[in-house]
Regions:
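Acidic, metal-coordinating helix/loop segments flanking the phosphotransfer/catalytic sites
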Residues: 36-54
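Acidic catalytic/metal-coordinating carboxylates
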Residues: 39-42, 65-71
Length: 126
């Protein structure tokens, strides 16, 4: 695993403004090696064609939800070990439990607060 600040991170969200906020938040934390995808399908293409150390994805996306993307990531042998942090407006406990059972490493409820986001990332890699 590369040093934390050198990690290549894929940010997946259907809203460009949200991707920008997440990428800027990661940059504030010293994570500058980011790429982005606007849906689950393009995220899978990127994940299969490049090496990523970490994925931040949105729960609610058209075409392929964050949950479906998580399941796809966990189903591919060379991707299943990549840590995934899900960002969601939906804090429903049953959804969170289902995502954790599917292999989610951590989640953050929107709006994303920098210190909480940092703590979640640190916990994944401790």
């Amino acid at each position: 695993m590369p040093a934390e600040r050198d990690m290549k991170i894929l940010v997946v969200d259907d809203f460009a403004a949200t991707r920008k906020i997440l990428i800027n938040t990661l940059a504030q934390l010293g994570y500058n090696n980011t790429d982005e995808a606007d849906d689950g399908y393009s995220a899978l293409v990127k994940l299969k064609s490049a090496i990523f150390d970490f994925v931040v994805l949105e729960w609610n996306m058209p075409k392929m939800s964050g949950m479906e993307l998580l399941e796809q990531i966990r189903a591919v042998p060379n991707l299943k070990q990549i840590p995934v942090l899900m960002v969601t407006e939906d804090g429903l406990q049953e959804n969170i439990v289902a995502a954790v059972k599917a292999g989610l490493n951590a989640y953050v409820i929107k709006p994303v607060e920098v210190n909480n986001f940092a703590k979640k990332i640190e916990k994944i890699f401790e």
